[in-house]
From Swiss-Prot:
The keyword Coiled coil appears for this protein: yes
Gene from which the chain derives: brk1-a
Coiled coil: 41-72
Cytoplasm listed as a keyword: yes
GO process terms (BP): actin filament organization; cell motility; regulation of actin polymerization or depolymerization
Keyword annotations from UniProtKB, A to Z: Coiled coil, Cytoplasm, Cytoskeleton
Location relative to the cell: Cytoplasm, Cytoskeleton
Protein name: Probable protein BRICK1-A
PANTHER family: PROTEIN BRICK1
Organism expressing this protein natively: Xenopus laevis
Length: 75
């Protein structure tokens, strides 16, 4: 019976090692996904802010161009 326990024990230990490895991989994938989601949100926020600033600059340029075209002074 001892000879039968040895392969069974080895299989059990291998199964636990596999489960631990899978847990490490799963945890790492979750951390990567969390980072990517956070990075995405940060980029979207920064791009939205940049877009607002560019839109304001474009409007200001259009306003200045219109005043220059009409010959008005800018002061």
């Amino acid at each position: 019976m001892a000879s039968q326990d040895d392969p069974v024990q080895r299989e059990i230990h291998q199964d636990w090692a596999n489960r631990e490895y899978i847990e490490v991989i799963t945890s790492s994938i979750k951390k990567i996904a969390d980072f990517l989601n956070s990075f995405d949100m940060s980029c979207r926020s920064r791009l939205a802010t940049l877009n607002e600033k560019l839109t304001a600059l474009e409007r200001r340029i259009e306003y200045i161009e219109a005043r220059v075209t009409k010959g008005e002074t800018l002061t």
